[in-house]
Amino acid sequence: MEPWYRVATPRKEVREGRSFNPDEFAIHLEQVVAKNAPEDYREPKQFFARTCWTRALRDHAGMVLRRLSGETANTAPVLTLITQFGGGKTHTLTALYHLVTTGAKASEYQGVGDLLKEAGIRAVPEARVAAFVGNAWDPKDGRETPWIDIARQLAGDKGVNELGPAARTTPPGTESLARVFKAAGGPVLLLFDEVLNFLNRHRGMADQFHAFIQNLTVATTGTTRGAAVISLPRSQVEMTDWDMQWQDKITKVVRRVAKDLIANDETEISEVVRRRLFEDIGSDRIRKSVAKTYAAWCFERRAQLPPEWTAVDSAATEAKAREYLRSRFEVCYPFHPATLSVFQRKWQALSQYQQTRGTLASGVDPTASPHKWQRPSVGYIIPATFGYAHWDADGQLVLGWINEVPDQEACETSESGT
């Protein structure tokens, strides 16, 4: 059996070990907008080449594009993006930004053509975009308040004038915001990220910002070609009572008119990780052969193996159960399904674990240096010999070796048995 590292080819930066800290995989929306983000995130073509179009991302983007195209069915004027820490919310916001700032040309990018067919629209609508990133926003001349900044992004000085002179101290009402949208001269998309971080840093503006968001959601509802996407954290990691109070207030205001979206479907994490870490996962023939061999071996020994290895529905027929297990091994390749299961079952319970981003960072070392962690005959990246990441420069998550004895014994037997 071919070992995985002779079949799959990691990306160049992974082979060189350049990406290790979770921050290496983090997207900063404000940098994308300012055109000073790393090239993989800054350039739309490269960004979409590395984007996994998960079901969640296709649904989110499709709803927004339909709304901006003037469609009202199967969409909403305000969307809340619910996500685990490091779970893909900024990737979704960045995808939306690149789509609507590129417009019709975006159909040339990987996956966008299929997205348009699924959404039932002919082309990507070009829109004026205002992005508010709370952990990067501070007042300065020309953007004394968040609403002045947003008005300027949408319609320049004309947009700011529509707010009136009181905007320097008072949040605008729905009519003023409607005038700003009109001044933009076309579809408008509003992207909000890290709102709670902004409130925490500018507590004196909390009540004003709360009123602004309330009026903004109402004004957006009154448009036919406008949408607002607001990211809200699912977890309450390191939140103070004040943080939780304001998160609850903002959430209640937004959800009066918003549709909730979940940023990353956990069942598709494997494809996200594969797309980001590997430039090629080898021939279909080899992958299918390895998956079939492993799945057959595990199915015959399913009573002795940990349940997360097989996840077989006892109510299914034997043929369906075998096929499900085979497809699971094939979809996860070159990662053993149990490897990804460790992240989803156990690590997510850790308060500082960053879901997709943490999985990516942890997968770099064994992917870049397979001979260090794997035996020559191993067909998959398996959990028992997986050297997990340890990043501690800022006192962040520090994890050593994970060595699950039942999994290790099963893997050892699997190697000799297959």
Enumerate the language-model features and the residues they cover.
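Conserved P-loop NTPase mechanochemical-coupling segment
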Residues: 40-50, 127-171, 196-204
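Conserved ATPase-coupling elements of RecA-like P-loop NTPase cores
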Residues: 198-209, 239-242
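Conserved P-loop NTPase catalytic core
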Residues: 118, 125-140, 144, 218-222, ...
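Flexible phosphate/Mg2+-sensing switch loops adjacent to catalytic phosphate-binding sites
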Residues: 75-78, 97-133, 160-171, 232, ...
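Walker A/P-loop-proximal flanking segment of P-loop NTPase domains
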Residues: 1-87, 94, 99-100, 249, ...
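Mid-core helix/loop region of P-loop NTP-binding domains shared across ATPases and GTPases
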Residues: 160-192, 203, 210-219, 223
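Extended alpha-helical interface modules used as scaffolds for assembling large macromolecular complexes
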Residues: 1-42, 119, 132-137, 177-178, ...
